[in-house]
Amino acid sequence: GMYCTPCESFWTESQLVDGKCPDCGRPVQKAQEEAYFFKLSKYADALLDLFENTPEFLQPDTRRNEMIAFVKQGLEDLCISRSTFDWGIPVPINEKHVMYVWLDALSNYITALGWPDEPELYEKYWPVNVHLVGKEIVRFHTIIWPAMLMSAELPLPKQVLGHGWLLL
């Protein structure tokens, strides 16, 4: 697919805006490499149900409406490994691959609490009441992260607040 290096994001051709990254507006490059994928498309209905029937999960409404529209476009399966460079966390079943940056970054919310090996802190603090995130990473925190948690049958954060930018 198409890849935006500054955003560390993969896009389909139809998601591009004038051939550029829809998030930052920069040029994208065609990426072709061996990779593992997470079946994100499997969770589209569950995510739509979450957004539409639990509106407090994602606020403000403008962010929730953006994510509903994004999911309704059709979710592509998510590339979760890279094989064209060697920095990063190795994939345990194939050391020629490293984890996609957002996969390990999002999982840090629970692995930093000791999940799954030392669950005391995880059980005390998860699920969190609120994730406060910038608008440019709402998609990762309200589509990819919940789908990852759903696949592991773990509870979701109770709410995600996607704030705008403060410009001074």
For the regions a language model picked out, list residue spans one by one:
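Cys/His-rich Zn2+-binding cysteine-cluster or related metal-binding knuckle/ribbon modules and their
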Residues: 1-16
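Structured secondary-structure scaffolds
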Residues: 3-6, 20-168
